[in-house]
Amino acid sequence: MSAVLRPAAAALAFLTRVPVARWIDVRGEDVARGAWLFPLVGAAVGGAAGLVADVTANWLPTIAAGGLAVALAALLTGALHLDALADTAAALGARDREHALEIMRDHAIGAYGVTALVLVCLLDAALLGALAESNDAALVGLAAGAAGRAALLPLAFALPYARPGDGQGRLLSGLGAVTVALGIAVAVLLALPAGLAGLAGAAAAALVTIVLAFAARSRFGGVTGDVLGATAKLAETAALVIAVATLA
């Protein structure tokens, strides 16, 4: 039973702040084994956030409902992907690859990082608020969350780890093609309840992932934990954008 539970618990612990390690002994190698479940974890976070938007939009302005949804997602994940986005955006202003990797290790956030963080949070809040007007935020949030976490898998599989030494992203260095394919299949299945909007959003997330893969290879020489987290966040936001456009 532990061989089944540990990978699932590892996926939850890797992507959220749920303290599953208190009850289940999670090991580093379990993260790669449970990576195909990343979309399911993302769906749970995105669906919960969207549900908050759907419910609170009944008595709050939609932008406020969307803001509460973003806050809940940040609380559940410890703002993990937002932090990664800020660090990656800050690194884009570096003079060379080595300096970029050094910036991503620094806990300080520069102007690029702050700008990226504010813009994405505001955009997410506006999009979830717009979806809540028609009570679609939960289903679309679920699909977008799954697509965003699925984006981690092909990047970690296809690109080398750019930073010497250990790091969170290196836990995914042992991913296999079957795990990646299974994770993508799970994300597609989770997009189906949202209909065309969910599938269009998943396609947008895939396109963003491809673009960021080329950018990461060119700028950083591969991926880091921050690059993976930033990709998950941007892919999720892209999925929300296209889903809203599809439903408009």
What are these regions (language model features)?
Residues 1-78, 82, 92-99, 106-248:
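Hydrophobic alpha-helical transmembrane segments
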